[in-house]
């Protein structure tokens, strides 16, 4: 049972790390490369979010992450990205 808890904790940490990496990638892209209205920005964002959602779905199916925890990871990332988008469009 302890091994399963360790695996669940590791899965949750990895998903959170991946979400943080997406946020960092988008920050770098906005800082250096493009504007939020650029199709490239939107494509990268959509692709990254899709990939993370698939990771979350897979972890949920394996029983490594509760569905609600997965939703919270996605929701937190969406909120952070929304704040970032607003900051760059208001400049």
From Swiss-Prot:
Coiled-coil spans in chain: none
Gene3D superfamilies: SO2669-like (1.10.287.750)
InterPro entries for this protein: UPF0358, UPF0358_sf
Disulfide cysteine pairs (residue numbers): none
UniProt cross-references to Pfam families, sorted A to Z: DUF1507 (PF07408)
Protein family per UniProt: Belongs to the UPF0358 family.
Oligomer and partners: Homodimer.
Record-given protein name: UPF0358 protein MW0995
């Amino acid at each position: 049972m302890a091994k399963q808890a360790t695996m669940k904790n590791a899965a949750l940490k990895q998903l959170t790390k991946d979400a943080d990496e997406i946020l960092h990638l988008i920050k770098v892209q906005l800082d250096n490369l493009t504007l939020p209205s650029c199709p490239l920005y939107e494509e990268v964002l959509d692709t990254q979010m899709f990939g993370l959602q698939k990771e979350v779905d897979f972890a949920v199916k394996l029983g490594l992450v509760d569905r609600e925890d997965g939703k919270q990871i996605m929701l937190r990332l969406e909120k952070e990205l929304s704040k970032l988008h607003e900051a760059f469009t208001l400049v």
